[in-house]
Amino acid sequence: AARTLGFVCAPALFQRVIIDCIDEPSDVEAYARNRTALTDALAEYGYTYVEPDGAFYLWVKALEPDANAFCERAKKYELLAVPSDSFGMPGWFRLGYCVSYETIVNSLPAWKQLADEYR
């Protein structure tokens, strides 16, 4: 049988640290910058995506019906995407952008090359 490990509640150390951080403002500008760079490029390359309202990832339509096969092909370009079949969205994949801006920019040529394979 499979066993899932996780937190039932936040560890005591996290609870003590969060007391000092709870009133700090959130800086989401980096995520917005990453999202804009990624979505602008993906749209230019012919990808369809769902614009997120607050998440730090995109739902992107795979360029073939089998999202698992598409994500496997993406690995050839050192791109990491999660097929969304297990999220109830076959034919799509999840793409996180909670990385550095440089990582986003450096990935863009690979997303274009991958799209070019399907033309």
Question: Where are each of the predicted segments found?
Answer:
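PLP-dependent class I/II
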Residues: 1-119
